[in-house]
Amino acid sequence: MLKTENLSVGYGNYVVVEGINLEINRGEILCIIGPNGAGKSTLLKTIATYLKPKKGVVYLNGKKIHDLKPKDLAKEMAVVLTERVNPGNMTGFDVVAIGRHPYTDLFGRLTERDKKIIIESARAVNAEYLLEKNFFEMSDGERQKIMIARALAQEPKVLILDEPTSFLDAKHKIELTLLLRKLADEKNLAIVVTLHDIELALRIADKMALIKNHKVIAYGYPENVMKREIVNELYDLKNANYSEVIGYFELKNNPIKNKKIFVICGGGTGANVLRYLVKNRYDVVVGHLA
């Protein structure tokens, strides 16, 4: 479906990431993870043809993606970037309608089918109630829903999203993450997304790519990629460790109290007690009775 072959990306004469070999099929989600400045956004913009590759090729259904005409590509791929948009006094309906541009006539007139798809796209992201609302009056979470609805209105087979949860609170982050999984499953979309939240990425990803130091340091199924030593290296962790059990980070314990406390627990029963003791800088040992 979508494939990169020995791809190198960057700006001007500067190569940000090189030797990228990724592949994603319809119905799958590929999450790209990495520290700030690693080149995640540059990679997505190259895949979306906003930037030309420094080397290598991006294929879409076996065709070189940078050779496709913009209108033809817009019918196959939709993109939602991080940058905030300012469409003035446009309503949610007007913004979603932009997604029909590849299909409208010279004057941009909407057919009844176009209008039906606009409503269905908003409904797919639980945003039908926002169609008559002015975009500037919407919350960040509502705006993101409308932007994804606009992308869906293009009737794409591939959806590219750059850090879609950046401006969202915890509730809307979870809702959006679950929405992406739903779209991949129900609409059979191939989704490529960059995320900062590893915990959420693990919940939805079929494949993960970790980027650091100008290259992809790990790529594959999450359970094979998200190993403690790999994630610790990815973020140069000194005062924390990535836990494969909980799928997130645990702060290292630097005890300052002389008492050593032995905690008998198992099966996650001691988690709250252990966190309390570590937070209060006790020297903690864990085990079970023989």
From Swiss-Prot:
Annotated PROSITE patterns: ABC_TRANSPORTER_2
Positions of ATP binding: G34, P35, N36, G37, A38, G39, K40, S41
Gene3D superfamilies named in the record: P-loop containing nucleotide triphosphate hydrolases
Domain ABC transporter stretches: 2-238
One CC-aspect GO term: ATP-binding cassette (ABC) transporter complex
UniProt keywords, alphabetically: ATP-binding, Nucleotide-binding, Transport
Gene Ontology molecular functions: ATP binding; ATP hydrolysis activity; ATPase-coupled transmembrane transporter activity
Pfam families linked to this entry: ABC_tran
The family this protein is said to belong to: Belongs to the ABC transporter superfamily.
PANTHER family listed in its UniProt record: IRON ABC TRANSPORTER, ATP-BINDING PROTEIN (PTHR42734:SF21), METAL TRANSPORT SYSTEM ATP-BINDING PROTEIN TM_0124-RELATED (PTHR42734)
Protein known as: Uncharacterized ABC transporter ATP-binding protein MJ0873
